[in-house]
Structures are given as C-alpha cells and as structure tokens.
C-alpha cells in the first residue's frame, strides 16, 4: 500500500516517476511480494491526494497507465492496482467513475471508520458488512475484496476535543465472526484471488492490531490462523 497521506503526500509527476521506479527496482521483484495473477499488487491509500498532485484525473490516468507499462517492461507481468474505497455514499463521490477511468483492477477498504459509524458496538458494525460488500461488488466495474478491522480507538493521538469515536466491545470472538463472513464472501464470488484485507498488524495508537497484548493474548492471531477460519 502506498500511504501518501499528508503531511504533503501529494506528489508531482517527476516525484511520482522517481517513487514508482524505486518500487519497481527495489520491491516488486522480491520473491515474497504479494501478487495477483502474477502481477505485483499496489493499493493507493489516498486517491484524491494522488489526483491533486498529478494535476487531475486525466493526467493521473496517463501516469498510472505508464506505471503499469513500466512494470510490464521490467518483466513483472504488469501491475495490479487496488483502490481504497473511502467514504463512498453513491452520490457525492466519483469513485465509481475513478475505478474504471484510472485503470484500477480491484478495490477494498482500509478500516471500518471509512464505511460506517465506528462509535458503537463492534458486533453492530460487523452485521452491516455483508450487504455493503455485495453492493460494492457490482457498483464499480472491478472486483471488491472484503476488509475486516480489529476495532478502532485513536484517542491516544489526540486531545479529547478531537476524538473521532471508539469501537466498543471488540474482541477476538467477534473479529473471528467477521472473518468468517469475509471468507463466505470470498468463497461465493468469482474473484481473481482469495484475499481478505485486515486492519491491522500493529496500529496500536488506532486500537486495531493483530499483535498479542496483555488484554487478549494471542486471541486475534488465533482467530486468523489457530481456529482454521480461513482454511487453505
């Protein structure tokens, strides 16, 4: 994932070329780099910021198409570009147009706060996920991969006046239930890969991490692997 959020994460064409060439040379050819259909996968975190930095949708489309071609020319088979779906309501954003116009191959989310009111019980948020996944699977013209979060609490980062809500009663059992719903989605849709995005490995200051702690031990990691949720 290219996390080019502020401070000043928007980049012009020259810097974009430099950064993406470094990705090609240093990362995409690594044998452990994740691929779909043989192509390295890159998720764009902040699409509006990217478009602003590259001076509009048309020039961004040209830059991304050239990026894909450079990946192909480097013997990488091309590039699988993934768009992060963010605050989509079907009316006010143009993400449904961007997905096709900019040449994205799939989309997913980064965390629950982008799609739902997070200031409530985890179970209530999880119950809303399958209908949203179904809607997005047909609305954008590209495959949608489901996303599951551990929770949300970024209050350690801010004064009390800037807190954005806290997910209540998140626990490994509810996380496992959400993973099972995501697996059901993947099992029943014709996707180019069996991919579920999880937030996150180590976002301690956002209250969404898989790593073990004193409160739940290895509970979240066991929900992913030890209980056989995802299978093979």
Please state what every model-predicted region is.
Residues 1-232:
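Glycan-processing catalytic domains of CAZymes
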